[in-house]
A protein has these predicted regions:
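Active-site-flanking segments in enzyme catalytic domains
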Residues: 1-193
Length: 193
């Protein structure tokens, strides 16, 4: 919605969120610190991610080993191309299942919250491994990119995980207040169009 809330949606730039001086000012003045409660959540999430990752990897490594063994003991029915196709299919399924499960750990949405904190840090948190999700410093060179990602993730969490919004609000009350105000204004603009 932020993209389409521009003054002229047919032209690039001048997104609704970054055209709001109040949001840009609050964003610039918001600390990139992480409260203990949020840091504990991220640590728990990382631990659970590793468990899920290891579980999914083990499941598919067993299937890949069975496939490889069938080639070695000559019980595999098919050509080398058939083997490669089945192998690639297993690897793809492993990656898809791991990604799906990782995004839904602990009710989902924690990656969105991590992305917000990564944006506040200018990508440093992802670069240093403080968070698992985000874009890193090369993406966040521009303040506008940070704001765009923050508003997108905030809007998603507002719908799917209001409990995580409350956690962010406890840590960054001024930012949350301005994000809420921005979304209200954007919804008014969309309603007028």
């Amino acid at each position: 919605m932020d993209l389409y809330g521009r003054k002229d949606p047919s032209k690039s730039g001048n997104w609704f969120s970054t055209s709001r001086t109040a949001l840009m000012d609050v964003f610039k003045s918001t600390s990139d610190s992480i409260s203990d409660e949020v840091a504990d959540l991220f640590a728990e999430h990382k631990k659970e991610y590793r468990r899920v990752r290891d579980e999914v990897n083990a499941k598919y490594q067993n299937l890949i080993s069975e496939l490889n063994n069938s080639v070695m003991d000559k019980t595999f029915q098919g050509s080398l191309a058939d083997y490669k196709k089945q192998y690639n299919k297993l690897v793809s399924a492993m990656n898809d299942e791991r990604d799906y499960m990782a995004r839904n750990i602990m009710g989902g949405g924690i990656g969105n919250l991590e992305d917000i904190y990564d944006a506040l840090s200018g990508g440093v948190f992802r670069d240093k491994g403080t968070v698992m999700y985000g874009h890193g410093s090369s993406y966040y060179r521009s303040q506008e990119s940070r704001v765009h990602e923050t508003i997108a993730n905030y809007a998603a969490l507002s719908i799917t995980r209001p409990d995580l919004i409350e956690l962010l609000k406890a840590d960054k009350p001024d930012l949350v207040a301005e994000l809420d105000a921005t979304i209200v204004e954007l919804l008014k603009k969309v309603g007028d169009g």
